[in-house]
């Protein structure tokens, strides 16, 4: 037995929503009188909304009650949703559509494993939704990556044993989650950060069905 399913992270793998997260978090940080850099934003990739805010407050040595934190997180989300509402298929990352088409044509199951609570909106706007046989997002999971829950739920929904799944991830926490879940991982980004993955590539243009099957 070999490859049966591919599970995709969303932000940083299929679409570049990190730039919108950055702009919205920056806007929020500025209202709190804080600065927020792209380097700090890097550390929020794959991390849930509430945890991201907690980190930003920690970096600034700020504390506030949970109620206030929830208020700020939803303020940021409002701005973020406004930004992603204008997304189109042009914002799908290089190589993604070609690979998804090839997987579909070869009856490989396709699942989403994202921490985002806005994943469905993004998939709708970019026209990616019809490719997916199962969607697992931040509304479904209770434990964040590196916990393997998001991918294990995906495999379960697809009816595939984890060992026949390959995960595509741009965040080291996501690669760790895939490995903990007994799946193979392809890292999208740099070797230094994602070295634990079986294969690391710059983007999906470097991947076709044969490359994935060769991991087995
Ligand atoms: P939301 P992924 C993650 O998406 C993003 O990388 C991360 O920056 C974001 O905080 C998280 O989703 C939650 O997003 O605020 O939309 O629920 O990489 O897991 O697809
Ligand atoms: Mg990601």
Task: List each model region and its residues.
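Conserved SAM-binding loop
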Residues: 14, 92, 112, 143, ...
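Asp-based, Mg2+/Mn2+-dependent phosphohydrolase catalytic module
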Residues: 1-4, 97, 101-102, 116-216
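Short, acidic loop-to-helix structural element flanking the phosphoryl-transfer center
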Residues: 2, 82-112
């Amino acid at each position: 037995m070999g490859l049966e399913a591919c599970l995709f992270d969303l932000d940083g793998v299929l679409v570049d929503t990190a730039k919108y997260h950055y702009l919205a978090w920056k806007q929020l940080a500025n209202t709190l009188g804080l600065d927020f850099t792209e380097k700090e934003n890097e550390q929020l990739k794959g991390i849930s909304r509430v945890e991201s805010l907690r980190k930003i407050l920690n970096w600034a040595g700020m504390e506030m009650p949970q109620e206030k934190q929830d208020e700020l997180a939803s303020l940021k989300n409002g701005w973020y949703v406004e930004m992603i509402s204008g997304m189109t298929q042009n914002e799908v990352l290089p190589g993604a559509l070609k690979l998804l088409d090839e997987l579909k044509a070869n009856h490989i199951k396709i699942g989403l494993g994202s921490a985002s609570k806005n994943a469905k909106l993004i998939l709708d706007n970019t026209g990616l939704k019809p490719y997916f046989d199962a969607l697992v997002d931040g509304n479904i999971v209770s434990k964040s990556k590196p916990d393997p829950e998001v991918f294990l739920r995906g495999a379960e929904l697809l009816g595939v044993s984890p060992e026949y799944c390959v995960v595509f991830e741009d965040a080291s926490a996501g690669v760790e989650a895939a490995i903990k879940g007994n799946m193979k991982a392809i890292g999208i980004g740099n070797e230094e950060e994602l070295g634990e993955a079986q294969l690391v590539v710059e983007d999906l243009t470097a991947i076709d069905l044969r490359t994935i099957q060769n991991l087995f």
